[in-house]
Amino acid sequence: MRRGGELEREFPYGIVRQLFEPALAGADRAYRDELLSGAAAFAAPLFCGDYLVRGESRKAESAFATLHGLFWLTANLSERRPLVLAVDDLHWADRPSLRWLGYLVRRLEGLPVLVVACLRPKEAEDPLLAEVVSDPFALVLRPPPLTEAAVGVLVREALSPDADAGFCAACFAATGGNPLLVRELLAALASQGVSPTADKAATVRQIGPEGVLRSVRLRLSRLPPEAGLLASSVAILGNDVEPHAAAALAALDLQATAHAAATLARADILRPELPLAFVHPVVRAAVYNGLAPAERERGHAMAARTLAERGAAAEQVAAQLMRTSPRGDRFVAASLRDAARRALAHGAGDNAVAYLRRALEEPPPRRERADVLYELGSAERLTLGPAAADHLRQALVLMDDPVRRGWTALELGRMLFWSGGLADEAVDVLEKAIAELPPDEPDLRQRLEAALLTIAVEEPRAYPRMLQRLERLRAHPPDTSLGGRMLLAALAYHDARAGAPLSPCVARAESALAGGLLYGHEAGMGWCHVGFVLAYSDRLDAAGRVYETVLADARAHGSVFAFALASLLRGTAFYLRGSLADAEADLRLAIDACESHGFAVGLPTPFAFLADTLMERGELRTAAGVLDRVAAGDEVPKTVHLLSFRGSRGRLRIRQGRTREGLAELLELGRRYEALGGRNPAMHAWRSEAALALLELGEREEARRLAAQEIELARQWGAPRALGKALRAAGLVEGGQRGLALLHDAVEVLEDSAALLERARALTDLGAARRRANRRAEAREPLRRGLELADHCGARPLAERAHAELLATGARPRRRVLSGLDALTPSERRVALMAAEGMTNRDIAQALFVTSRTVEVHLSSAYRKLGIGSRLQLPRALAASPETRGEGERVALATPSS
């Protein structure tokens, strides 16, 4: 049983350490390595002394990496035998430990693990505590008070078998049946020599609950002075105190400390075993509150210095300093800043913010105040604190050095835009920082320019201001520093959106990727920009390699955010290819990873692509539900990332027969896209989609105009998928012989493209047009090929249409018989493919950031649908489908880098 404590609340992962350190310390080297293997290694720095094993630089990721690692440490411990995690006084637990418990209880299914926690009923309203207590599988026990009869039994056991009934009733009335108060009341009565007779009932009432505290102090006052000094030291230091630390604070030698500890144990004040701890928090409170306020504060200040001199963890020192008043002490501010850095390295952002706020109150030396404000604002950004921007603004005002101002502006600008939606201010901040930078800071300058360009292409009010800078940026090619690579990637993405010729954009993107700097944690959106350019230029294999590299890095560092973002973008690439099952699996994985790890995706984009994928698979109702999760009905989400969402909702409305509404969404998408400099139809083919909607509404001339514009823009860009899609739409709008020629051109353009679904559409539309033109024999071949490709992609509505068109030509195509493989959900298919490659359930779970139980459920379902009994049969069962040959997720299992 481990226990929370008032002082320990300031110590990140205090409960976690209490729970796991004994098991790890008692394990031999081989078993310890086994316990901390795989994803559990992400938790190792908590127990290895060096808080910065993986560096401070991955602060945003470290919280989730630590939670993920602790979950797998728990799973590893439970492999040999069932595991019980018991915590008393959970309401006093530190917040990182509470966050971990909430994370754990949602993933316990299938693990032989029992979590038992005790807390005060009224404390359960705290959101983190409520997350644990209100879990659907939690069994909440609320023990009633002891009955009067039960109190009588305890009185007779403690004082005398002949205790008077009236005396026992008085004990019950004085304590209300609270077990702790009964225990302490009886100890107080025994220490005062009160006999349990009827005439002493009034004495019981006089002592009462408050008398319990007085009793502890009375017992303490009767002990030697050394015992009082040691009790005060342990009360100051908190529970589980090492004798050396308590002795140093009490100014006692070790022998005197041992004697005093034994004396306190006999007096039922301290526990008899080491480390030193009170028998109950109420006893500690009695000792602690018996000290004068000035004495308590002086004790905490001395304890902090004593712990620091003894090499204690920075957080232990900080826990003491948090109980002191500001005095302008440099040691205090420096110690709190150090503790904040270490807390951030493990994702304990709440604690880091508290430390830095207290450091600011100290206050630090004037020349360091700007640094503390910067550190505080950065920490608050990670915890979504509302004061983050204000603290970064204050830091910026106090800084004289233009380089420091530049780094602060970079942090503030990104935060204003991504968290606050304040693009105008973000642009002002970044532009001013760039103007102030000296010429010998090219790396920082290019990082600032890259951030500025990234913001501008997403915000209509900021974009016109950015246009004035673009020519100058192009005139001075970025260098090979990280900032240069980031700027090169941002320029490539901007020009690709603008519809510039494909070749120079791809060249820029590939140059930005050279050397691998963009895969680093500081590269921001750099690798995303490169991936987008490659994917929308139809270099889907190259884009896939970018995403695979990021996924491997995300697994190696436990970065759920990078894992989710790379899964989103890889899912997008799968969608563009037409691999709809893979696209759905990745997109759902991205969304689930974000939601289950405590942060929202924040963008409608993954929901939009998932809805598009579901529509192509014929699941309109599910697609509508996905979009409603972003904005129900006709609402518009309050985010800058509206374009993909608008397009997806427009396509859904058209498929639902609400063509006019769908057209309005597409036209609004086009208006917004152009306001952001967007002209490339590879990213948003709104013109061709609007043209087909206009055709359906009988507005052929406007449809022709939009279709012709898209052909021109697609030719300018030069990627087959975009041009093929534009030609197909124009062919449908034109009709007749010219329409047939355009559809034939679309098929030819797409013939060697990786965009299989778009090729299937073009083939089906060409065949259908030939059938309508009474050229049935010529219609059959494109329709057969369209049907085969649509089946391969999993595009059921398109396959059904191609099948119906083939029947109309007089052909007799065989209906596709759905095999067990076709019945697998995308998630089941993904897990089955990984298992077929030899990965264990644990390997798969760690790679996908899910639990082993989730993998077991997916595999069991897959076995049933495939008609097999074990994973040994998976390779043969999956190889039976051409759809899976050469595919699947090639996952190189990664462990935390050292």
Regions found by a protein language model. Name each.
Residues 18, 143, 150-354, 358-361, ...:
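Short secondary-structure boundary elements
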